[in-house]
Regions:
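Membrane-proximal intracellular helices of multi-pass ion channels
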Residues: 1-311
Length: 311
């Protein structure tokens, strides 16, 4: 139910994000405190992070998503009538150019009656508090999605505006924590250096994914999986991608979500080209150091930096 989701999943989404930031601040205090006997109270840090950072931030993002068309309600799922009926085969495939006679409930294709075809006149539309759940799943690098197909669903991510907001939310806190680190250790150049190292890795990965998805491969072109560019479509490997996002929006999300250990998707990464899919897996296998999860990405990068200094 919506209540169990709010009490279970949503609470854990906030707590998991706050935990990563709290651990990071304990590490930062270990760097800057010399004569102190402690590293602060974890529970105080956790409460402050949730109340002063995560709740206000996600309230704003939720309102932006609702304004962009993401659903946010407590209604049960609805069944609505289609504008016009469609015919599907016994295997569930839509029959193109089918002539439907609702009076006799027959389906005709190329002048022949399809006996096992079914006429669909209604559609199941899920409801619920999606916008608030999407906001924390992104800002907390929790991943997953409210709908089964994640942020590829038009009710969870309906247009380019919501897509932009959700993509920015993935890296918003991990990127900001780099500058927080520089400010905390009273050496902002350190924070900028770490941010630039992460950012350059992300840009290279994003460029590789975008180029390979736009160009495709000869094998995909021969099989008809790579669409030719048209006025309404930029072309490229559009298999597993939403036309409202295209190659650019899908590739950017793929790079961001795998760099930040987020896990949410707006396209199916299994359908990417071999090189494009390889880069997404490489970002995951780097161990959450290209921005990474909230808090844990930065202290992972700091661990690598410390090892590098001594090795």
């Amino acid at each position: 139910s919506y209540l169990t989701q709010a009490l279970g999943l949503t609470v854990q989404n906030f707590v998991s994000a706050a935990t990563g930031i709290a651990v990071l601040f304990a590490l930062i205090r270990g760097f800057i405190k010399v004569k102190s006997s402690g590293l602060g109270s974890f529970w105080v840090d956790l409460t402050r992070i949730v109340v002063h950072i995560l709740l206000p931030l996600n309230l704003v993002i939720s309102l932006l998503l609702v304004g962009g068309g993401v659903i946010q309600n407590l209604k049960s799922a609805e069944t609505v009538s289609l504008v016009e009926p469609i015919a599907v085969s016994a295997e569930g495939e839509i029959l193109e150019d089918a002539v439907i006679d609702l009076d006799t409930e027959t389906v005709t294709v190329d002048g022949e009656i399809v006996s096992n075809a079914q006429i669909v006149t209604e559609q199941f539309v899920p409801m619920g508090p999606a916008a608030s759940q999407v906001a924390i799943k992104q800002t907390g690098t929790n991943g997953g999605g409210y709908m089964g197909v994640n942020s590829a669903h038009p009710l969870e991510n309906p247009n380019a505006f919501t897509n932009l907001i959700e993509m920015i939310s993935i890296l918003l806190i991990p990127a900001a924590l780099c500058f927080t680190f520089g400010s905390a250790v009273k050496n902002k150049k350190q924070g900028v250096a770490i941010f630039m190292a992460m950012f350059l890795c992300l840009v290279v990965a994003l460029g590789c994914i975008a180029v390979t998805e736009q160009v495709g491969t000869p094998q995909l072109a021969q099989n008809g999986a790579v669409n030719m560019s048209m006025a309404e479509q930029a072309g490229g490997n559009m298999e597993g991608k939403e036309t409202r996002f295209g190659i650019a929006g899908s590739s950017t999300w793929a790079a961001f979500t795998t760099a930040a250990s987020n896990g949410s998707v707006n396209s199916m990464h299994d359908s990417y080209t071999p090189l494009g899919g390889m880069v997404t897996m490489l970002l995951m296998q780097l161990g959450e150091v290209v921005f990474g999860g909230v808090g844990c990405g930065l202290y992972g990068m700091l661990a690598f930096a410390i090892l590098t200094v001594f090795i």
